[in-house]
Amino acid sequence: MASTDTISDMLTRIRNACAVRHSTTQVPTTKMTLSIAKVLKSEGFIEDYSETGEGINKMLVLTLKYKGKTRQPLINTLQRVSKPGLRVYSPSKKIPRVLGGIGIAIVSTSHGIMTDREARRQGIGGEILCYIW
């Protein structure tokens, strides 16, 4: 089934896969989901990602990361902030810190998708997509 909000769909699939301790999960590939996967990998929330399939059936396979013998997920919370019905924008000086810097906010800027720290460092504001910790 086609989803109109691919970011929420991606976050929900990751949240559900972490809840049942799956090692991988698949999400439909878009430029946005690919950029978010790059940020998640660079911040250490997922091990890796790869693309499978061709054309309209292209999927992004995310390899999730767990800690310890009990396999506790590294991602505790995924919270969507800006939604299709209510967009949330923030200038660079007012981008919120997530849990005092422990978590990250993923921001869509004119220079691409990046973390809140990168956006503040570059002095760029944008749309706050989600919080992850």
Swiss-Prot record:
Keywords: Ribonucleoprotein, Ribosomal protein, RNA-binding, rRNA-binding. NCBIfam families: PRK00136.1 (NF001109). Pfam families: Ribosomal_S8 (PF00410). One of its GO terms (biological process) is translation. GO terms for cellular component: cytosolic small ribosomal subunit. It comes from the Bacteria. Disulfide bonds: none annotated. One of its GO terms (molecular function) is rRNA binding. Part of the 30S ribosomal subunit. Contacts proteins S5 and S12. InterPro entries: Ribosomal_uS8 (IPR000630), Ribosomal_uS8_CS (IPR047863), Ribosomal_uS8_sf (IPR035987). Transmembrane segments: none annotated. Belongs to the universal ribosomal protein uS8 family. PANTHER family: 40S RIBOSOMAL PROTEIN S15A (PTHR11758). One of the primary rRNA binding proteins, it binds directly to 16S rRNA central domain where it helps coordinate assembly of the platform of the 30S subunit. This is Small ribosomal subunit protein uS8.
